[in-house]
Amino acid sequence: MTAVSINAGELAVGGHDSVLEAPGLGSCVAVCLYDAKKKQGGLAHIMLPADNLKSRLNTMLTVRYDADREHALRYADKAIDKLIERLKHLGSFPDDVVAKIFGGSEMFVTLVSGRLSMGRKNIESVREKLKESAIPIVSEDVGGNVGRSVKFFLESGDVEIRKRM
């Protein structure tokens, strides 16, 4: 079994023998996309809601796709687009892919009342992008004030969540 740890601003895809891990999710959101027919999927560790700057992504195919110089994969919109692209490259059809999302916590007290927090912004941005991409969210554990670490088992599509205060 191949285990890959995905840090903030990174993503990875793999097949049935892979376990993708996103350690230390606070306000970050882990987006797990899974194709049950092909037993393959990917995980993006998203830091920020959206990239308003034009970024060029490295298109080189590797097992792991790290952020380029402009750190485009930190952003929900760019990371989800890239994750979908990589799964298509592996033979997945968009209609066969479902999503599971985790994280988006409020780790610190909001200092300015009425402002939407980073965790909440990340969650909303991820939901919006997945809806736009016609990928249903079938499971989630988001928000609150606890950190999370996740392990995504591509053989089954199961996700193990560890919470911490």
PLM feature spans:
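Amphipathic alpha-helical interface surfaces
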Residues: A76-L83, V97, N122, V126, ...
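Acidic, glycine-rich active-site loops and adjacent beta-strand->loop/helix elements
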Residues: M47-A50, G103-M107, G143-N145
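Short glycine-rich phosphate-binding loop at a beta-alpha junction
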Residues: D95-G103
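Conserved mixed alpha/beta catalytic, RNA-binding, or beta-rich assembly cores of soluble enzyme
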Residues: E21-L90
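Phosphate/ribose-phosphate-bearing ligand recognition and processing surfaces
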Residues: E106-G119
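Phosphate-centric recognition/catalysis
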Residues: T2-V19, P23, K37
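Short, basic and Ser/Thr-rich N-terminal targeting/leader segments
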Residues: N7, G14, L25-S27, D95, ...
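Divalent-metal-activated hydrolytic enzyme cores
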Residues: M118-M165
